[in-house]
Amino acid sequence: MKSNFTCIKKMPVYLLSASFCLGMFSCQDDVRTDGYSTKDVPELHALSAEQKEVIDYTPKNIVIAHRGTEFWAPEESEAAMRWARNIGADYIECDLQKTKDGVILALHDESLLRTTDVEVIYPSRQNDYVSAFTYDELLKLDIGSWFNEANPEQARSSFVGLDILTLDDVLMIAEGYRIKRDANGKRIVNRDENGKYVSTQYEPDPYDNGNRPGVYIETKAPYLFAGMEKALCACLKKHGWYDEDASKMKKIAYKNGVPGNVDIANTKARIILQTFSLGGLINMNKEFKRKIPTLFLMYDITNSTPASYAEKINFAIDNGATAIGPNIDYIKGYPTSLYPWQGDMIRRTGMDIHAWTFNTQEQFLKYTGPWCDPKKEGGADKNYVDGAFTNHADLAINFYRETLEGYLAKGLNYFRSNAKCGLPDNLHKNTPVKTAQQVLD
């Protein structure tokens, strides 16, 4: 039996019902105010002209599919990423690890114990980190069966035998492809003259519905994987997803030449970087010569004060970040880093807020405006969320498409403005209505 626990930003949604603590109240009564005045704010550093430009072209009200999904399919699997693309997420999110032979993986944990059968395949190495294995060795592991065991209601036979993805895989899935597999379901790969893994073969996904999401990438602390940011930049260049000259980035092809409902992959904001690491943020700023959307993540800021919070924001600004990623109060025991005074402080800088992790309608209502508007005046200033990480992209899309749109129909507009990037404020107003199961089927 695999452990279902993942820390902080990575807590699976199926634990939320037991640990989630949320009151049905307005921000006037909300403990998130924490006693601080929104005017009690230390000096905040100024954004550069380039940071402001990036913020202007980064879309607002975006749905970020956390690891594809943790709820409907095994996290960061091909099934999860294809589901997130087809359900209509604006971004599919992945974490980066690196193998012994330098392959960049889409995988959260440094340990393989939680989400693979490493204890069966490599019993003497089960406690080794991912970086101790070659990619060929990792391809022998099953990342799907544990999910079926832990989540019988979401279990599917097609999840059995799923393998660990690479960053290459995630980018290709975002472009409308799937991994090419043999009759036994094993991926078909290219090898060099010594038999070493070089790359994977892909084919057009017959279930591709035309959506072209962006990719939201998290790197770990530099001491875990030296040179990761440089390798990431090179990988994105190889695929045409990044270039110092934005005009030279690849045009992502559409299915049958017709754009889908999501087309973030064909914008300058096609890639967003994120990290909790101070050193990681510094390295991102160094390696990516052209500034791109970059998020500095925050969590578990116990006893935060305006001064200490401003210090983190200023570090982020000084090192190229264009957005802050605070956690909402979605798990008992982990204090939020998005109290109203904290959200107001971020707003004063002009940075975007991409918060994590939303898994219920009530959480969206609490942070996007409706529950912070006791006088029913409307206003985007009451919305502390430009982007929402979620394990339920289907629920998030429905919230924007129907709930916030419903408030707008009543004259209460809580949408953040997309006027500067030339997109509609409600990116999901016309997203087809499909259930998560329908997309999986």
Task: Enumerate the language-model features and the residues they cover.
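Accessible peptide chain termini
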Residues: 1-2, 292
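Bacterial N-terminal signal peptides that target proteins for export
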Residues: 2-15
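C-terminal motif of bacterial Sec signal peptides marking the signal peptidase cleavage site
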Residues: 22-26
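Phosphate-group recognition and catalysis centered on beta-loop-alpha active-site segments
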Residues: 27-441
